[in-house]
Amino acid sequence: MAEEPKTVDIKDMLHFKTGNIALPVLETILNTIPFELGFCDENDEFQWFTDNGHRVYKRFKETLGKNVLGLHHGGARPQVQELLKQFHAGTKDNFEFLLDLDGRKIYISFYAVHDENGKYLGCFDFTGDITELQQMKETAKVIPPMDAIKAKEAAEKSTDRD
């Protein structure tokens, strides 16, 4: 019988079906993404979050291991509780919404995480300030790559003449 490949080796390499990556590199990638990510386990305890300076909501290491319901304000608790109940039961897999916050457009999504056998592992959340993306869409502000390069070259030439 063939030995199962380890998912993490002594060099902190993570081995996935789709390739390998060093744990410090993956952590850096996750903290480079200009959005915030978080994870609550199957017991609804807050376990992990990205820490990249692009936060809409402040997160603190002291909240790790705490029940997620206690981390939400009273008005949101019933909705969070119902969503988690649906995630646990498998009747809902995701929930997403937009919200206006201090003049910014915030996109928030929650995903139920299941293993290959359907066992509930927890809830993954994604929060992002999409204000600039929305403005780009509204103004059709798209710069074709070649035009951007030509503009940069023109700017460099004009500085060379000064």
Please tell me what each predicted stretch does.
Residues 14-16, 25-26, 67-75, 144-149:
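Short, contiguous hydrophobic alpha-helices characteristic of membrane insertion segments
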